[in-house]
Amino acid sequence: MLTVDTARIAAPVDRVFRAAEAVERWPELLSHYRWVRMLERRPDGGVVEMAAWRPFGPVGYPTWWVSEMRVDRGAPAVYYRHVRGITTGMDVVWRLEPEGNGTTVTIVHEWSGPRWPVVGGITASWVIGPVFVHGIASRTLAGIKRAVERGESA
């Protein structure tokens, strides 16, 4: 499964990067995030528990996962490796590229799917990736864009 979400944000890369790495603030900025907890802090990131709603019309489906998060200020990029939850084994990278007077952010999710015999890969490619991963990532990116462009981010 591969999902890619991209947005251009009218703000300098350092400001966008601060919002991307300040995951504990996301529930304040992003209404679909139920909570974010830093379970273990490390100099370059840590272990983070995240929970979000995936809306389906008026109904929200609860999602939850734990990731090892690594921040690379030099790249600039933020990397995640899902270590608990249905998406265990998923690799995620947020890449930030300066572009003119703004920043292009690309979020890439890669995953071979849950360890379910026969249907794991199909479920990842047809349901989990396009419906859940893209559904949450696209909302996260749009919310970060709104917050940064309004000056509300970290």
Label for each model-derived stretch:
Residues M1-G45, A154:
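Hydrophobic ligand-binding cavity/cleft-lining segments
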Residues M1-R8, G45-V47, W64-V66, A77, ...:
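Intrinsic-disorder/low-complexity, polar/charged segments enriched in Ser/Thr/Lys/Arg/Asp/Glu/Gln
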Residues D5-A7, V36-M38, W64-V71, H82, ...:
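Hydrophobic/aromatic beta-strand elements that line small-molecule binding cavities or substrate pockets
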Residues I9, A52, H109-W111:
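Hydrophobic beta-strand positions in extracellular immunoglobulin-like domains
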Residues A10-V13, R73-A75, E99-N101:
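Short loop segments at secondary-structure junctions
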Residues V16-A20, W26, M69, V105-I107, ...:
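Hydrophobic pocket/interface hotspot
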Residues M38-I86, S138-A154:
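Glycine-rich portal/gate segments that line the openings of hydrophobic small-molecule binding cavities
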Residues R81-S138, I144:
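Beta-strand/loop substructures that line and gate deep hydrophobic ligand-binding cavities in soluble
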